[in-house]
UniProtKB/Swiss-Prot annotation:
Protein name from the UniProt record: Glutamine--tRNA ligase, cytoplasmic
SUPFAM superfamilies according to UniProt: Nucleotidylyl transferase (SSF52374), Ribosomal protein L25-like (SSF50715)
Basic and acidic residues bias (residue ranges): 200-212
Gene: OVA9
Pfam families referenced in this protein's UniProt entry, alphabetically: tRNA-synt_1c, tRNA-synt_1c_C, tRNA-synt_1c_C2, tRNA_synt_1c_R1, tRNA_synt_1c_R2
GO MF, one example: glutamine-tRNA ligase activity
Taxonomic source organism: Arabidopsis thaliana (Mouse-ear cress)
Compartment(s) of residence: Cytoplasm, Cytosol
Record keywords, A-Z: Aminoacyl-tRNA synthetase, ATP-binding, Cytoplasm, Ligase, Nucleotide-binding, Protein biosynthesis
Amino acid sequence: MVLKDDNSEKSIELFISIGLDEKTARNTINNNKVTANLTAVIHEAAVTDGCDRNTGNLLYSVATKFPTNALVHRPTLLKYIVNSKIKTPAQLEAAFAFFASTGPEDFKLNEFEEACGVGIEVSPEDIEKAVKGIFEENKKTILEQRYRTNVGELFGHVRKSLPWADPKIVKKLIDEKMYELLGEKTAADNEKPTKKKEKKEKPAKVEEKKAVVETTAEPSEEELNPYTIFPQPEQNFMVHTEVFFSDGSILRCSNTKEVLDKHLKVTGGKVYTRFPPEPNGYLHIGHAKAMFVDFGLAKERGGCCYLRYDDTNPEAEKEEYINHIEEIVKWMGWEPFKITYTSDYFQELYDLAVELIRRGHAYVDHQTADEIKEYREKKMNSPWRDRPIEESLKLFDEMRRGIIEEGKATLRMKQDMQSDNFNMYDLIAYRIKFAPHPKAGDKWCIYPSYDYAHCTVDSLENITHSLCTLEFETRRASYYWLLHSLSLYMPYVWEYSRLNVTNTVMSKRKLNYIVTNKYVDGWDDPRLLTLSGLRRRGVTSTAINAFVRGIGITRSDGSMIHVSRLEHHIREELNKTAPRTMVVLNPLKVVITNLESDKLIELDAKRWPDAQNDDPSAFYKVPFSRVVYIDQSDFRMKDSKDYYGLAPGKSVLLRYAFPIKCTNVVFADDNETVREIHAEYDPEKKSKPKGVLHWVAESSPGEEPIKVEVRLFEKLFNSENPAELNDAWLTDINPNSKMVISGAYAVSTLKDAAVGDRFQFERLGYYAVDKDSEPGKLVFNRTVTLRDSYGKGGK
């Protein structure tokens, strides 16, 4: 429910007066709780006539983050903010931590001021000294990596020693020191484009590709290190969330000091995260973002990340998927601290379910699935909701022993059927399934639900940060309700936007459908954005991780990232790592008439564009003989001013070889199809043609070059968002998404290429050797073309 219009406009005016922009102000009034809190904060701070934007932003944070167990102290904090004694987000976060720990108890002002850095002025000289010290410590690395140095790490070192330093001054001095040490950027430094500041994407809109624009805006701390948004484990005593019940009561979930101390003793204060995939399908690029968040946070903080298989559905899990997930996680560069399964905890989960019943928070229900759905829609309690605890305990034991038929009973959590949050409608904790479990065997015939097991195992594994995508945000109330009901340790929960990319589908159901029904060639089809498909296509894990890091860990949901952005990162990586070679896709024979038929000239071709002449490994040998092949697209009968290919009477340069001039054209019987070209070469290289062509020659007279198969891939779906087509999404599949060229010619050095090897086919794109290759028959997948459209406008 939104406030009435007259009150809404007054609230908007009030919020704008403290520096909020109109859009933020209007979004705020859609949340009654935040509106009420912010209005109260503004009045408590006595700034109803307005204030500067920095103060207003701090007040907004107080309204949304102040620990509810210390509301009595909020006026004190507001006084410090208005008087500019607390003026940075870092100081404010320290204040929140202080008050969350203090609660409603009295405190000493000097201890509060010390905890928040009040009165501490960090001079530019102090910052300059700290920056100088960090550069001295890391000088060798900086000189090696030059402008590819991770500036975020340098920034973090300075902030660690000077937590109250102005981040803008820190960044400015780091930039100046980099320039002082390295000088102007070289061409090599500039290979990687300057990071652009992106416009905030509108919900459900495809990310717009803007022209490259230089910006002088200072990057935020989150841009330098995306993990700074997450609190430290010792701060996990603050109120995690508030659960509003239909009777007006509020559950404010937080860890007690005793519970948190016990947790910290077990973990040693380290960060513990988990990556919890279901083993019922192959991982896709969205999972790459989840891995970056889960494993990345643990790595950045020197902590641990579990790989935990959420194997609560015995009918869906397969060993194939388990093996695939473990392999892909390692390929992506992540090392699990420990591999666990939810099924490892089946006994503990059962015991806790019994305890939940004993505490009056769960009951055995006999409603059918349709009845449960109907009662939820009507917000009605189940007829069995208030049955005696002993009766539910007995029935739950019978469920466990297999006495009750499948579908005749479930264990449901006694939450709040009248709540505004449908994820509090007495969610199912256990259901009966007479199916053996891939790991637990036939020991169990009841299995826990995701809503029951997920949060409970998080607690049992002492997870500090439970991170998931935004569609799970409404489940947060149920997550904390259950842990609170069982008096268990509560992890810090945070949701981020899921990764959506254009021209594909990432729904597990849809992926499974097109794989099962052979619209594609398996889970690792190179047209899919499954991680195995991307790997088979030739994409590196480094490129995928760079793509994910570039997107950031945001909460702006509903946006779709254009696939060209991913391709940009792929090109950046392969440009540095893929050696150059030459392949002709559609060969056209060229006879060099002024070269003897038995003559073979061995030439040097560059593997790398910046190859040094004194480095033999940077070159490979190519033969130049009387018969060479160019691509059919590089010849036409009629020349034009803007055409740089070969034409009758025209010269071109064969890359790494000689200029050639077309002297004659031989047609097929239809007098239209060009069968071969006759040309003369310029051994002295006196002519300087503008056009440069790639080519492949016979390695010896009469012996054709190596023949290879090349597969060209385009976008799998024609529409940027096929999901918008609802049930008609299959009609959007691009029938031309895969083209196979079976008669391409390659230089002889490629004959020893192995599966997974990546190359740049000059003038064509990046390609990788496919697993379908056999001795004597190489198959290449096109990874990506050479042209980069990301950030250049248009498609």
